[in-house]
Design a protein with these regions (language model features):
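Conserved ABC transporter NBD signature motif
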Residues: 37-51
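Conserved ABC ATPase "signature" region
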Residues: 78, 92-111
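H-loop/switch region of ABC-family ATPase nucleotide-binding domains
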Residues: 175-176
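Catalytic Walker B motif of ABC-type/P-loop ATPase nucleotide-binding domains
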Residues: 140-143
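Conserved catalytic motifs of ABC-family nucleotide-binding domains
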Residues: 136
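Conserved ABC ATPase signature
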Residues: 115-119, 123
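Helix-to-loop junction immediately C-terminal to a conserved catalytic motif
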Residues: 29
Length: 199
């Protein structure tokens, strides 16, 4: 696989189960080491790792479905910084404001004190996206973020991502089905039998 992602790209990667989407993500996230080929990000070969680049990652089904899972939405959000607050010179009040702003963007600010396990799958994904965005990443990677969402929620999510992309955020979203009707993505990739083809 030889792929390039340019700064400011909004890429959608689709494909059936077993087509190679998960393997590609594992290569990108360094869970697997490529035996050949390369992955270039912002004109730099990242096959050896991101080397300090700020990455926001929203994994699929990343939260426990146990309704008694003790963490609250606020506690989940507080893990979204790349460095401790004191290192960044951010006061507790300012960070609390950032948390609320990120949750508000995802229409989840009213759930701040709710247990994450009590939320629906779609609501949990919204919280995880807000968590990924609160640290101001350079690249946002999303693995099946629309799982459990209806068409209205998908449209709302994609509008948020589009606005972020227009402000310069580079996005790579993996999806089982086509999201062309919903997104303003500028590139569409399709995984087929271990190969990734640009449409």
């Amino acid at each position: 696989v030889n792929l390039k992602i340019r700064q400011g790209d909004y890429v959608i990667l689709t494909g059936e189960n077993g087509s190679g989407k998960s393997t590609f993500l594992k290569l990108l996230l360094r869970e697997l080491i490529p035996q050949q080929g390369s992955i270039k990000m912002f004109e730099k070969d990242i096959s050896g790792g991101f080397k300090g680049m700020k990455i926001g990652y929203v994994p699929q089904n990343s939260i426990s479905k146990n309704q008694n899972f003790p963490a609250t939405v606020e506690e989940i959000m507080r893990t979204g910084l790349y460095e401790p607050i004191w290192k960044r010179g951010i006061s507790g009040k300012k960070y609390q404001k950032k948390i609320l702003e990120a949750l508000s963007e995802m229409e989840m600010d009213s759930f701040l004190t709710s247990r994450i396990g009590e939320l629906s799958g779609g609501q949990q994904q919204r919280v995880m996206l807000a968590r990924a965005l609160v640290g101001k990443p350079e690249l946002l990677i999303l693995d099946e973020p629309t799982t459990g969402m209806d068409s209205v929620s998908i449209q709302s999510l994609c509008e948020v991502l589009q606005k972020r992309n227009e402000k310069g955020l580079t996005i790579l979203m993996v999806s089982h089905g086509s999201l062309k009707p919903y997104t303003g993505a500028n590139r569409f990739w399709n995984a087929q039998e271990g190969r990734i083809i640009e449409e």
